[in-house]
Amino acid sequence: LDEVRDKDIANISFPDLVEITGYLMLYRISGFTSLNQLFPNLAVIRGRTLFKDYALIIYEMLELENIGLNNLVMIERGNVRIEKNEKMCYVDTINWARITMNNSPYLEVGRCLQFQI
């Protein structure tokens, strides 16, 4: 996604991607408010290779409002790190212990802008 222009980002989607064998890192990608647009059918992250013990990293996605990985049911190995996503809401409503096979996620949840006055 490094070479994609902001105006084209809305057209990018990987609907056939159901499983990732390694890790998924999302870092400073603009143009997305939800990952459902990008990975609508992602169900499993295996974590056979990890990034510093993490299988899912969502970091500094400044426009992301919700994770939206509605079909994600299992992270087989590795932890979750979600940090510095200023607009993200509802991260703490996901049962991460069930999805991560009892691993402990690292969640730094900022204030949800939707609820600020």
Give, region by region, the residue ranges found by the protein language model.
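Extracellular/luminal ectodomains of secreted and membrane glycoproteins with large N-terminal domains
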Residues: 1-117
